[in-house]
Amino acid sequence: MHHIKIMLSRLWQCADRTRDRLLFPGCDFAAWVTQEAAGFTPEQGNQYQPSTNALPQVLRRFPITSGDRILDVGCGKGKAMALMRRFPFGQVAGFDISPAMADVANRNFRQLKLRDCHAFQADAATFTGYDDYNYLYFYNSLPKPVFREAIGHLEESLARRPRCCRLIYLNPVYHDFLVRDTAFREIFRRRSWSSWFTYVCYEYRPG
């Protein structure tokens, strides 16, 4: 069964790369990048893989307005952010531990002429600038210790500036930690044939 999943995953990757070339001409979203090639260690982050094209179907479940701001934690080349920009977020931002990956993302945004869409370099283990955001996006970009640190910083922000916050998580390998050890609660999920491509959405409400 595991070998079948790997084969199906490779077929999906090939199909998704083809779709990305059609959807985002002139952009570099599709190719996977290892930690070594991106300039960081496996202890700092996971390899880059582009988010799936199903993200807009997930975002349509939310009443997004210009008052909402979303942050992609571990944005890589920025594909998820380009998809987010189809919605009326007041701001779409993202960061990656690799400055080279953030540079690729910003080149992609310029190619697509996307406004209010910017990637910057930061380490999720130490980043604390969550106060301005009420939507967060993760695509299993972080090892568990770093993910715990990031969620801890997010919870500090929510205590400091109480607000409703939604977290969108693709390939939610640390789902149990979120629902057991944090104040976030699952509100819905979009299932796929593999957990690798399953989205789970969570919500935090103050009080």
Spans of features found by a protein language model:
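Conserved SAM/SAH-binding beta-strand->alpha-helix loop
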Residues: 98
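Conserved SAM-binding strand-loop segment of SAM-dependent methyltransferases
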Residues: 114-124
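Conserved SAM-binding loop
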Residues: 105
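S-adenosyl-L-methionine
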Residues: 1-65
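C-terminal substrate-binding/active-site "lid" region of AdoMet-derived donor-dependent transferases
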Residues: 145-201
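Conserved class I S-adenosyl-L-methionine
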Residues: 68-74
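Glycine-rich SAM-binding Motif I of class I
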Residues: 78-82
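Conserved S-adenosyl-L-methionine
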Residues: 86-91
